[in-house]
Curated annotation (Swiss-Prot):
This is Olfactory receptor 51E2. Glycans are attached at N5. Olfactory receptor. The activity of this receptor is probably mediated by G-proteins which induce elevation of intracellular Ca(2+), cAMP and activation of phosphorylation of the protein kinases PKA and MAPK3/MAPK1. Activation of OR51E2 may affect melanocyte proliferation, differentiation, and melanogenesis and may increase proliferation and migration of primary retinal pigment epithelial (RPE) cells. Activated by the short chain fatty acids (SCFA), acetate and propionate. In response to SCFA, may positively regulate renin secretion and increase blood pressure. Keywords: Cell membrane, Disulfide bond, Endosome, G-protein coupled receptor, Glycoprotein, Membrane, Olfaction, Receptor, Sensory transduction, Transducer, Transmembrane, Transmembrane helix. The gene is Or51e2. GO terms for cellular component: early endosome membrane; plasma membrane. Residues 1-24, 75-98, 160-195, 258-272 are extracellular. Pfam families: 7tm_4 (PF13853).
Amino acid sequence: MSSCNFTHATFMLIGIPGLEEAHFWFGFPLLSMYAVALFGNCIVVFIVRTERSLHAPMYLFLCMLAAIDLALSTSTMPKILALFWFDSREITFDACLAQMFFIHALSAIESTILLAMAFDRYVAICHPLRHAAVLNNTVTVQIGMVALVRGSLFFFPLPLLIKRLAFCHSNVLSHSYCVHQDVMKLAYTDTLPNVVYGLTAILLVMGVDVMFISLSYFLIIRAVLQLPSKSERAKAFGTCVSHIGVVLAFYVPLIGLSVVHRFGNSLDPIVHVLMGDVYLLLPPVINPIIYGAKTKQIRTRVLAMFKISCDKDIEAGGNT
């Protein structure tokens, strides 16, 4: 134990184990997805902020979701691309812990916002006359603040739990970025408190959110099926399609990644890493596409922006 340290000066990121020679080529699709995520989510934030007709709870939640996706993808992708293209494998102990916190906390905040959006759909469909009173813009902002505090408080202990561990042997992480489970596996001392708290936090945040989202949609489906006409039922379901797509894009990779981390020890490490990279990029890429395609105001505004840009280019070409 005398040779053990409670911190490493640095950790070494492997990237994709066994495919190090192909890192350069893996960087291009990742950069493309990251660029789409940045562009799409920035557009959503800009349109919701500048279009007064979108200053309603559902779209304010969407703006929050886009901001979270920007932060979540940006917390990892620059380092991943530096690793893949410039072989920048080193990450300091404190930077690793900070990255770990942001990944877990932002995921928890996003989960809370998705729950709030499900509640918005429930009130809008099951209690439409009370929607404006129950969910006004002030309440929406307060919910956003609660989501921020909830995600931060639940996952702030993870870096502190890592700091109490001793690392005696390897400082090599078989991943592209730092997550609690992978850093914990390098520790020499007892990690049971880390395992128990990590699992408890996930169940109390994501587990509870999934349960209440499922309950919301059970009540929504029951209410919609009681509507008299087919067109009314289709219209009511149509208002939920975008949110359902976003929920699936977030929770399906998250659940799959959690199962692989805890029960997939026999799987090739490549599976762990690729699933982790997909989990961080899939929601930020898909969310603005889903809402852009399904929301007329956003779709119209985006098309108008491109039309104005094209008209300016044509005028500039004509003047020359």
